[in-house]
Amino acid sequence: LYQASVKTGSGVSSLKEFEIEVDTIINIGKKIWAIVEAGKPVVNVEVNSASAMPAGVHSWQQLEDWQIPRSSTYRIHYTNLFGMNVVDFSYRVMFTYGGSYKGHGRYVTGATILPAALDVAWGFTFKAAVEIPTVINLGQAQNPIGGIQMNVNWSVDTVVKSSQTRASYFVDGLGNLKELN
């Protein structure tokens, strides 16, 4: 059990008790966000991301021992019957790993998928979105390891055809990145 000083609307500080549960991992962040809409990358003022943190922790800054972020770039492309590229999309899977709370566990923060490059030919519409279906504990209650599954869903549409595809990735607090397809 921990105590924290909390500012109230009247400017008076009060003490609030709260509990950090290192054995319960939660997602701090959005579960679904668009990264490409109407064939153009979505520009965000703040990066949409997910985290696998202990319950009761509200910021990655409450943890220590973070490692350098990992990143891997993936590319998809579609060609027409003439062999011309009609959609060429590159995206990055990024995350920071290894954070611990008072020496316990290995957690993930800043897990995201960002557009790196996009070219779409005339007559084609490309859309992509990211979803975080699950955040889990890969370790034990005394020494949790946060894990996050991330899916990137995209569609390529023309007047006569629509195609939808998904790629899935899993990242964890030990720094592992695995393609699930």
Predicted regions and their residues:
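Membrane-inserting effector segments that mediate pore formation, membrane fusion
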Residues: 3-46
